[in-house]
Design a protein with these regions (language model features):
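Class I SAM-dependent methyltransferase SAM/SAH-binding core
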Residues: 2, 7-57
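Short conserved loop adjoining the S-adenosyl-L-methionine
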Residues: 58-62
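A conserved beta-strand element that flanks and buttresses the S-adenosyl-L-methionine
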Residues: 68
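Short catalytic micro-motifs in class I SAM-dependent methyltransferases
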Residues: 71-74
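A short glycine-rich, Lys/Arg-flanked "PGG" loop and its adjoining helix->strand segment in the class I
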Residues: 82-94
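Conserved beta-strand signature within the Rossmann-like core of class I S-adenosyl-L-methionine
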Residues: 95-102
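C-terminal alpha-helical "lid/dimerization" subdomain adjacent to the S-adenosyl-L-methionine
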Residues: 103-158
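Core SAM-dependent methyltransferase catalytic element
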Residues: 162-180
Length: 180
């Protein structure tokens, strides 16, 4: 099992704990941010999880049954995303799955703006200040490049996936499942 962009390793640790009785599963958390991995080693250590400080676009994946990625592919340069999904498809065993969650762009600017406003209201209701929200928005400009739902599904199809769908959606965040 690979977790691409594992951050602090929280999800991977929960997954490993849930399946601790299955002896042949190896878990790999991959992230480019060393401090996240230091935290993962400290707070989410497990003997069957290996945390790797690697750039996924340059890392060779071993054969796997499951690859997960939460809010990571949207930060990969658009021209490299297809290559990454091709690599993921090739590394999956037959019947293996890719589960990923991404921010998606709507088909029109008006809808994007409305969803963005709803999400900002949600952040304010949860204690974020306007300054924090604006600073976060500025920090992501030019780095976070969301694609539309259709563009994400098209990339999966070009990579070779046939069985793929959106399995959940909340505002501008979409959950995709693709099975080889």
């Amino acid at each position: 099992v690979y977790d691409i962009g594992c951050s602090t390793g929280t999800f991977l640790k929960k997954l490993a704990d849930r399946h601790k009785n299955k002896k042949n599963i190896k878990y790999y958390g991959i992230d480019v941010v060393k401090n996240m991995l230091k935290y993962a080693h400290k707070k989410n250590y497990s003997k069957n999880i290996k945390y790797l400080n690697k750039d996924i676009t340059k890392f060779k994946l071993l054969k796997s049954d499951l690859i997960i990625s939460f809010y990571t592919i949207q930060f990969i340069q658009p021209k490299k995303r297809q290559e990454l999904l091709n690599k993921i498809y090739k590394s999956l065993n037959w019947g293996g799955a890719l589960i990923f969650v991404e921010k998606v762009r709507s088909y029109d600017a008006r809808t994007n703006e409305q969803i963005s406003n709803i999400y900002e209201e949600f952040k304010i209701e949860n204690g974020f200040t306007l300054k924090e929200i604006i600073n976060k928005k500025k920090s992501l400009k030019g780095i976070l490049e969301p694609f539309s739902s259709k563009a994400n599904l098209d990339m999966l199809k070009r990579a070779g996936f046939i069985d793929m769908s959106t399995v959940g959606k909340y505002l501008s965040f979409e959950f995709f499942l693709a099975i080889k």
